[in-house]
A protein has these predicted regions:
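Small-residue-enriched hydrophobic alpha-helices in membranes
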Residues: 1-112
Length: 112
């Protein structure tokens, strides 16, 4: 699985973090996929995450974070995840927690 696909799956995890995949979040993920030229189905990814990780988003997040190793890919993934988090117009507690866990996993150098 490419780093781009892992980044998109991380975006799906962020969208699911607040207990729902909203239309705004789905649209933002599809927009990102188009920008990076990846054919990506958000609903298939959601199903895969729920099946593969039994709905445990922390485990899914750790898995996808660990699969993104290049510095520029980490910076890009961080920006994508932030865009998804803000796409519905508000940043919820679980989304903040998701970003904090990213910072802890990758280190402070990837966050402004």
């Amino acid at each position: 699985m490419s780093e781009k696909t892992n980044s998109l799956n991380l975006c799906v995890c962020m969208a699911l973090a607040d207990h729902g995949l909203g239309k705004d979040e789905t649209a933002e993920i599809l927009k990102i996929a188009k920008e990076i030229k990846v054919d990506f189905n958000v609903h298939n990814a959601t199903d895969e995450i729920n099946e593969k990780f039994s709905g445990d988003l922390d485990v899914a997040q750790d898995f996808y974070l660990g699969n993104i190793t290049k510095d520029n890919s980490k910076l890009q993934a961080k920006e994508f995840v932030k865009r998804v988090a803000l796409s519905d117009g508000e940043l919820k507690d679980k989304e903040v927690r998701f970003l904090v866990r990213m910072k802890q996993a990758w280190g402070y150098q990837y966050f402004d």
